[in-house]
Amino acid sequence: MADVLHGLAPLVGAGARLLICGNMPSVMSLAAAEYYGNPRNAFWRITGDVFGFAADAPYPDRVEALVAHGIAVWDVLRSCVREGSLDSAVRRESMVPNDFGAFFASHPTIGRVLFNGAAAETNYRRLVGAPPVPALRLPSTSPAQTMRFADKLAVWRGELAD
């Protein structure tokens, strides 16, 4: 039996304007206590390209860059049971969502949600309900997602522009 996994605290600053919402951090991310800790995940390459920071900069610097651009990052799941890192391996009955009601109440300047992939959107809507602000699903930045990097970058760039 797999152990219960617990997600990470949100990355958010005062005046955040946009929430990027994933499903649950990967095994590598949880081990490093860093969002998108798998170097094959395109998240930091994409956000670095859009906001002008190095994708391989120290984690605190990357987080600071996102916060400076009004970007918050959090995941749908507070905890779950999952074998490996794939979203499809999460046991549905084990899913416990984060408290998004309290999150949005504490961060009223967030005006949009971007879901990082289908699992994040599906699980948010199933477990939490409709987001209180406009929301859009973007292609997953996961290495398991087969879309070409250039295509992912183009879609994400269009939605992240300041």
Where are these regions (language model features)?
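A polyanion-binding, active-site-adjacent surface
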Residues: 1-112, 118-147, 153-159
